[in-house]
């Protein structure tokens, strides 16, 4: 049958319309909630989802896909799961979890997803970075060689830390772990004020995991009163936040710190503390029905911490020479450093500062056990003058502890042993320091030099702290400045501090 001219015209018109028909519909992959409870949602239908991808529930609550199974997807919920019901729609976002980063973050308090919680409005100009990225490779790294000063005599002299190092702070509750971390942040104030370029400034990121909100508020107040908030970022996943946010917060903080590392700047990140992160991860893993291992932790709990801490590094000159220094904190139970999480984190880090309850109650604060504390790479970054001054003090302290234990049983001691006990008691007194009072490195050198070279030997123990406070204030600024020179202390240079310390000591004997 032949088509009439009118019908042929219509057919060709329809054909051209159909061939030129384009749809611009946005296709969202959606699933439905099969079950929900304890912060975990099982979702059916998200077949193309990626591991670690963000999803959005119908109620507006977000979650992250952690378990990809044949039948369904295990999603951990960021927030309350009370608004999520069985049968609710779940939409893929198509993006892996990312957080804001950049200098706009300085002075702000944010949650585990980088959302401001300090009531100061939205963040200004910033970029976004993925929370989970691969750590720099071997070729991109360089040996640690620049000092990262904490302002604590016990740390900077005996367990020095370098920029790009990972130094673990480990101890029981209430032994001053957070105090060491906060003092380190406060100490950067005067160092940053002296910095002449971006490459000398050290920015700080403090990640609070599972702490009380009141504790975090107190910390914000301390930092703002000391004007230390201007170079710091606070990431807070408090005890009242869901476990997924406590698990994610360290990675979010690390991504913020990596912005500085990758742009040729220097940053310090404090994870306070990783024991609580491991507990949050254990809770999530057990609820996701992953098989438990030792102490009911999942099998990949080592990888949880290793992939986080490996991101702290000193970059090579070709990649910008930036650095990210990490101070992870681990809480022990009754001083047991052989528990699962402590034994996992100790081999990952480049050394540890061990704090003890007994020393704390004896008035030795910071309560650092010098025998157990070690810095594996920090000595390469230590100032030459400091290395010369405190080189023998660690050995003398070890000998003192050994002899002091024996001296309790007998009173007949020869002159050499008596001198060793006398010097050791003074060397134990010198590292004591009040909280929130970091000391510049040149003043530390002067005080330790006085103790190591016997200027305090004839002084009563209770007057040593007065002597320590007096000498840095009465010394010539030129003498203090000479300690910072790269050449170290030569015999000629020693004459001036020797004369000054000898005269100063007379008033305290």
Curated annotation (Swiss-Prot):
Provide this UniProt record's keywords sorted from A to Z.
Answer: ATP synthesis, ATP-binding, CF(1), Hydrogen ion transport, Ion transport, Membrane, Mitochondrion, Mitochondrion inner membrane, Nucleotide-binding, Transport
SUPFAM superfamilies per UniProt? C-terminal domain of alpha and beta subunits of F1 ATP synthase, N-terminal domain of alpha and beta subunits of F1 ATP synthase, P-loop containing nucleoside triphosphate hydrolases
Taken from the UniProt entry, a GO cellular component term is: proton-transporting ATP synthase complex
Summarize the protein's role. Answer: Mitochondrial membrane ATP synthase (F(1)F(0) ATP synthase or Complex V) produces ATP from ADP in the presence of a proton gradient across the membrane which is generated by electron transport complexes of the respiratory chain. F-type ATPases consist of two structural domains, F(1) - containing the extramembraneous catalytic core, and F(0) - containing the membrane proton channel, linked together by a central stalk and a peripheral stalk. During catalysis, ATP synthesis in the catalytic domain of F(1) is coupled via a rotary mechanism of the central stalk subunits to proton translocation.
Show the Pfam families listed in the entry.
ATP-synt_ab, ATP-synt_ab_C, ATP-synt_ab_N
In this chain, ATP is annotated as bound at 171-178
Assembly behavior: F-type ATPases have 2 components, CF(1) - the catalytic core - and CF(0) - the membrane proton channel. CF(1) has five subunits: alpha(3), beta(3), gamma(1), delta(1), epsilon(1). CF(0) has three main subunits: a, b and c.
Report the family membership. Answer: Belongs to the ATPase alpha/beta chains family.
Q: What is the lineage of its organism?
A: Eukaryota, Viridiplantae, Streptophyta, Embryophyta, Tracheophyta
Gene symbol here is ATPA
Where's it mainly located? mitochondrion
Site feature: Required for activity: 373
Q: Has keyword Protein biosynthesis?
A: no
Q: Which HAMAP family match?
A: ATP_synth_alpha_bact (MF_01346)
Q: Please identify the protein, giving its name as recorded.
A: ATP synthase subunit alpha, mitochondrial
CDD domains recorded for this chain? ATP-synt_F1_alpha_C, ATP-synt_F1_alpha_N, F1-ATPase_alpha_CD
Question: Where's it found, cell-wise?
Answer: Mitochondrion; Mitochondrion inner membrane
The terms under GO molecular function for this entry are:
ADP binding; ATP binding; proton-transporting ATP synthase activity, rotational mechanism
């Amino acid at each position: 049958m032949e088509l009439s001219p009118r019908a042929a015209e219509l057919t060709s018109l329809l054909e051209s319309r159909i061939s030129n028909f384009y749809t611009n519909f946005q296709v969202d992959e959606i699933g439905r909630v099969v079950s929900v409870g304890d912060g975990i949602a099982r979702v059916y239908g998200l077949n193309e989802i990626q591991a670690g991808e963000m999803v959005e529930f119908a109620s507006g609550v977000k979650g992250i896909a952690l378990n990809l199974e044949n039948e369904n997807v295990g999603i951990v919920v960021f927030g309350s799961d009370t608004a999520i019901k069985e049968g609710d729609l779940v939409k893929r976002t198509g993006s892996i979890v990312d957080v804001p980063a950049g200098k706009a973050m300085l002075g702000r308090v944010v949650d585990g997803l980088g959302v401001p919680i300090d009531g100061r409005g939205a963040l200004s100009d910033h970029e976004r970075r993925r929370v989970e990225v691969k750590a720099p490779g071997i070729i991109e790294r360089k040996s640690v060689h620049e000092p990262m000063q904490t302002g604590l005599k016990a740390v900077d002299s005996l367990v020095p830390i370098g920029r790009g190092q990972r130094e673990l702070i480990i101890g029981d509750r209430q032994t001053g772990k957070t105090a060491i971390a906060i003092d380190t942040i406060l100490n950067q104030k005067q160092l940053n004020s002296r910095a002449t370029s971006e490459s000398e400034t050290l920015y700080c990121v403090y990640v609070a995991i599972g702490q009380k909100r009141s504790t975090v508020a107190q910390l914000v107040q301390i930092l703002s009163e000391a004007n230390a908030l201007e170079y710091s970022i606070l990431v807070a996943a408090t005890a009242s936040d869901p476990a997924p946010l406590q698990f994610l917060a360290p990675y979010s903080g690390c991504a913020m710190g990596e912005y500085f590392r990758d742009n040729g700047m220097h940053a310090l990140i404090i994870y306070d503390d990783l024991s609580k992160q491991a507990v949050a991860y254990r809770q999530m893993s057990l609820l996701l029905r992953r098989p438990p291992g030792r102490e009911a932790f999942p099998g990949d709990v080592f990888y949880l911490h290793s992939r986080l801490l490996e991101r702290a590094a000193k970059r090579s000159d070709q990649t910008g020479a930036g650095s990210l220094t990490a101070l992870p904190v681990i809480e022990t139970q009754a001083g047991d450093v052989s528990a699962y999480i402590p034994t996992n984190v100790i081999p990952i880090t480049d050394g540890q500062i061990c704090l003890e309850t007994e020393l704390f109650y004896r008035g030795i604060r910071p309560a650092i056990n010098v025998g157990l504390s070690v810095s594996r790479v920090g000595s390469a970054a230590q100032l030459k003058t400091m290395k010369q001054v405190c080189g023998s003090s660690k050995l003398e302290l070890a000998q003192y502890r050994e002899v002091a234990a024996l001296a309790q049983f007998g009173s007949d001691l020869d002159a050499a042993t008596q001198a060793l006990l006398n010097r050791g008691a003074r060397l134990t007194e010198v590292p004591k320091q009040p909280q929130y009072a970091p000391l510049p490195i040149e003043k530390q050198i002067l005080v330790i030099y006085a103790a190591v070279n016997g200027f305090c030997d004839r002084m009563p123990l209770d007057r040593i702290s007065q002597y320590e406070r007096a000498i840095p204030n009465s010394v010539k600024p030129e003498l203090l400045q000479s300690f910072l020179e790269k050449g170290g202390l030569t015999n000629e240079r020693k004459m001036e501090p020797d004369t000054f310390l000898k005269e100063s000591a007379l008033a305290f004997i």
